[in-house]
UniProtKB/Swiss-Prot annotation:
This is Neurotrophin-3. One of its GO terms (biological process) is negative regulation of neuron apoptotic process. The gene is NTF3. Residues 114-133 are annotated as: Disordered. Seems to promote the survival of visceral and proprioceptive sensory neurons.
Amino acid sequence: IQSTSMDQGILTEDSMNSFIRTLIQAGIWKNKVPKQTARTKDGMQTTVKKTEAEADAMASKDTRLGFQPVVSVDAELLRQQRRFSSPRVLLSENTPLEPPPLYLTEEPMVLNRTSRRKREGKSHRGEYSVCDSESRWVTDKSSAVDIRGHQVTVLGEIRMGSS
């Protein structure tokens, strides 16, 4: 399982408890369903399954004593427990077809971008800002200088469609 973002959400205590209960119910916790031996009135021994509360108490006792349970988890069970807070996270069992986008290297000829880069961090390839030195929209200009220093014409209106 691979993640393409470091923006994974933190699991809450309730979701972790739910996950552990699922493991216990599936018989995966310690690779068996916990059982205990009980005596009936006639002295015969019977095997009785522990309740969920008793299993949780035993697990917490084992943790306090330093025992780490061996857990083998099926991939399908983990697939059901994915909980991330960001839609930008993509999990896949396959390797990505291409590497992640590269960061632009610092270019010495780029003007007026030093303070902006410090504020916003490095920009990704193909991501350009419309206006670097002003923090408001400019609507009355017919020409401008782009980030590479070239003179460009600013379109007052963009027509879309077949007109």
